[in-house]
Amino acid sequence: MFNQILLGIDGSEHALHATKTAGDLARNMKSQTLRIVIAFDPVPPYLGEPNMQAAISARMKEAETILENALKVVGEIPGEVHTEILEGPPAEAILDVAKTRKSDLIVMGSRGLGRLRGMLLGSQSQKVVQHASCPVLIVR
């Protein structure tokens, strides 16, 4: 049923729960592909070249660490696992990947690392739910 699963993560606790759920789904559904995507907002250009490069390097290192942890949580699945690190607004990046990779399902946490912790549904999750062309599973 869900051969192409897209997991959007950001390193939050909710994303960790979504990662476990996506791994379980991929195993149970015998999915062909689980694609794990992490996207971060662009580094502001006003930082200047040396500071900008340092900020980009720090974000890339953090993203790689988050992806490594996600791969451990997912564990062994019957299909392939692909990872992508993207720069740009997270919801837009997830929607773009879902469309271009023809995802059957998007899995993501209900809230991320944003400052509005009291919200029931995070702004990025809400945007994905509103604009996705495939089913979206939001995990708490």
Where are these regions (language model features)?
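General small-molecule cofactor/ligand-binding pocket signal
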Residues: 35-37, 82-86, 137
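Glycine-rich, Arg-bearing micro-motifs that act as flexible, cationic patches
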Residues: 108-130
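Short secondary-structure boundary segments
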Residues: 38-40, 110-111, 140
